[in-house]
Protein backbone atom coordinates (compact mmCIF):
# COMPACT_ATOMS: atom_id res chain seq x y z
CA UNK A 1 0.00 0.00 0.00
CA UNK A 2 1.29 3.44 -0.90
CA UNK A 3 0.86 5.55 2.23
CA UNK A 4 0.97 8.82 0.27
CA UNK A 5 -2.04 7.61 -1.74
CA UNK A 6 -3.79 6.65 1.50
CA UNK A 7 -3.07 10.11 2.89
CA UNK A 8 -4.61 11.73 -0.21
CA UNK A 9 -7.73 9.56 0.09
CA UNK A 10 -8.07 10.50 3.76
CA UNK A 11 -7.41 14.19 3.07
CA UNK A 12 -10.40 14.22 0.72
CA UNK A 13 -12.56 13.14 3.69
CA UNK A 14 -10.98 14.69 6.78
CA UNK A 15 -9.04 17.89 7.58
CA UNK A 16 -5.62 16.34 8.04
CA UNK A 17 -2.35 17.95 9.02
CA UNK A 18 1.03 16.92 7.74
CA UNK A 19 2.12 13.47 6.60
CA UNK A 20 5.47 12.21 7.89
CA UNK A 21 6.75 9.10 6.12
CA UNK A 22 9.23 7.46 8.46
CA UNK A 23 9.92 4.55 6.12
CA UNK A 24 8.05 2.98 3.19
CA UNK A 25 5.65 0.99 5.40
CA UNK A 26 5.26 3.49 8.27
CA UNK A 27 3.81 7.00 8.21
CA UNK A 28 2.32 9.42 10.72
CA UNK A 29 -0.51 11.89 10.17
CA UNK A 30 -1.44 14.76 12.46
CA UNK A 31 -5.09 15.70 12.69
CA UNK A 32 -7.46 17.65 14.92
CA UNK A 33 -8.64 15.62 17.92
CA UNK A 34 -12.30 15.99 16.96
CA UNK A 35 -11.68 14.04 13.73
CA UNK A 36 -9.82 11.15 15.35
CA UNK A 37 -12.79 8.81 15.83
CA UNK A 38 -14.19 9.05 12.28
CA UNK A 39 -10.68 8.70 10.84
CA UNK A 40 -9.98 5.63 12.99
CA UNK A 41 -13.27 4.03 11.93
CA UNK A 42 -12.58 4.75 8.27
CA UNK A 43 -9.10 3.24 8.49
CA UNK A 44 -10.44 0.16 10.28
CA UNK A 45 -13.57 -0.40 8.18
CA UNK A 46 -12.46 0.73 4.71
CA UNK A 47 -8.67 0.65 4.54
CA UNK A 48 -7.86 -2.61 6.36
CA UNK A 49 -6.13 -1.17 9.44
CA UNK A 50 -7.72 -3.68 11.78
CA UNK A 51 -5.12 -3.82 14.55
CA UNK A 52 -4.50 -1.13 17.17
CA UNK A 53 -0.80 -1.67 17.89
CA UNK A 54 -0.46 0.93 20.63
CA UNK A 55 -1.65 4.19 22.08
CA UNK A 56 1.01 6.39 23.63
CA UNK A 57 1.58 9.96 24.78
CA UNK A 58 4.33 12.57 24.74
CA UNK A 59 4.35 15.42 27.25
CA UNK A 60 5.17 18.68 25.44
CA UNK A 61 5.25 20.67 28.67
CA UNK A 62 6.75 23.77 27.00
CA UNK A 63 3.78 23.95 24.63
CA UNK A 64 1.20 23.05 27.29
CA UNK A 65 0.04 20.03 25.29
CA UNK A 66 0.12 16.27 25.12
CA UNK A 67 0.60 14.43 21.84
CA UNK A 68 -1.36 11.18 21.60
CA UNK A 69 -0.28 8.69 18.95
CA UNK A 70 -2.59 5.89 17.83
CA UNK A 71 -0.57 3.33 15.84
CA UNK A 72 -2.61 1.09 13.52
CA UNK A 73 -1.52 -1.88 11.45
CA UNK A 74 -2.77 -3.28 8.17
CA UNK A 75 -1.41 -6.81 8.32
CA UNK A 76 -2.60 -7.72 4.83
CA UNK A 77 -0.65 -4.85 3.27
CA UNK A 78 2.20 -5.03 5.85
CA UNK A 79 2.09 -1.34 6.71
CA UNK A 80 1.41 0.87 9.71
CA UNK A 81 -0.09 4.31 10.12
CA UNK A 82 0.11 6.50 13.19
CA UNK A 83 -2.49 9.16 13.90
CA UNK A 84 -1.25 12.01 16.09
CA UNK A 85 -3.50 14.42 17.94
CA UNK A 86 -2.62 17.23 20.30
CA UNK A 87 -4.66 17.93 23.44
CA UNK A 88 -4.35 20.62 26.06
CA UNK A 89 -2.20 19.87 29.09
CA UNK A 90 -3.71 21.64 32.09
CA UNK A 91 -1.30 22.91 34.75
CA UNK A 92 -3.30 20.95 37.33
CA UNK A 93 -5.94 18.29 37.02
CA UNK A 94 -6.46 15.84 34.19
CA UNK A 95 -6.20 16.36 30.46
CA UNK A 96 -9.19 14.92 28.57
CA UNK A 97 -9.57 12.97 25.33
CA UNK A 98 -12.48 10.97 23.91
CA UNK A 99 -12.28 7.24 24.58
CA UNK A 100 -12.00 4.90 21.60
CA UNK A 101 -12.71 1.69 23.54
CA UNK A 102 -15.91 1.23 21.52
CA UNK A 103 -13.88 1.29 18.28
CA UNK A 104 -11.09 -0.97 19.64
CA UNK A 105 -11.88 -2.66 22.97
CA UNK A 106 -8.15 -3.17 23.61
CA UNK A 107 -7.75 0.62 23.75
CA UNK A 108 -9.24 0.54 27.26
CA UNK A 109 -6.00 -0.95 28.61
CA UNK A 110 -3.84 1.71 26.96
CA UNK A 111 -6.19 4.42 28.18
CA UNK A 112 -5.96 3.16 31.78
CA UNK A 113 -2.18 3.29 31.55
CA UNK A 114 -2.16 6.82 30.11
CA UNK A 115 -4.53 8.05 32.80
CA UNK A 116 -2.31 6.70 35.53
CA UNK A 117 1.08 7.63 34.05
CA UNK A 118 0.25 10.96 32.34
CA UNK A 119 -3.00 12.10 33.95
CA UNK A 120 -5.05 11.93 30.74
CA UNK A 121 -8.73 11.11 31.27
CA UNK A 122 -10.78 9.15 28.73
CA UNK A 123 -14.39 9.56 29.95
CA UNK A 124 -16.52 6.46 29.55
CA UNK A 125 -13.61 4.05 29.24
CA UNK A 126 -14.16 0.94 31.42
CA UNK A 127 -12.26 0.47 34.70
CA UNK A 128 -10.46 3.77 34.13
CA UNK A 129 -10.39 4.73 37.80
CA UNK A 130 -8.98 1.43 39.08
CA UNK A 131 -5.27 1.24 39.89
CA UNK A 132 -3.42 -0.17 36.91
CA UNK A 133 0.27 -0.28 37.82
CA UNK A 134 0.80 2.25 40.60
CA UNK A 135 -1.26 0.93 43.51
CA UNK A 136 -1.98 3.70 45.99
CA UNK A 137 -0.05 6.36 44.05
CA UNK A 138 -0.66 9.84 45.50
CA UNK A 139 1.76 12.07 43.59
CA UNK A 140 1.51 13.71 40.17
CA UNK A 141 1.56 11.18 37.31
CA UNK A 142 5.15 9.95 36.97
CA UNK A 143 5.49 10.25 33.18
CA UNK A 144 4.69 13.96 33.21
CA UNK A 145 7.84 15.93 32.64
CA UNK A 146 7.28 18.05 35.74
CA UNK A 147 7.50 14.95 37.96
CA UNK A 148 10.82 15.12 39.84
CA UNK A 149 12.08 11.53 39.84
CA UNK A 150 15.13 12.24 41.98
CA UNK A 151 13.16 14.14 44.62
CA UNK A 152 10.58 11.33 44.76
CA UNK A 153 13.26 8.62 45.07
CA UNK A 154 15.12 10.49 47.81
CA UNK A 155 11.90 10.99 49.79
CA UNK A 156 10.62 7.43 49.27
CA UNK A 157 13.64 5.13 49.46
CA UNK A 158 16.50 4.67 51.90
CA UNK A 159 20.09 5.02 50.74
CA UNK A 160 21.77 1.66 50.20
CA UNK A 161 25.23 1.15 51.70
CA UNK A 162 28.05 1.49 49.18
CA UNK A 163 26.14 3.86 46.90
Feature names for model-found ranges:
Residues 1-163:
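Terminal low-complexity/charged segments
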Amino acid sequence: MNLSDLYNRLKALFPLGELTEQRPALAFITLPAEFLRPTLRHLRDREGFTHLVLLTAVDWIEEGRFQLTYLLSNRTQACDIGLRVMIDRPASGLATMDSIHDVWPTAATYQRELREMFGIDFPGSPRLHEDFILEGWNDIPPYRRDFDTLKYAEASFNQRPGR
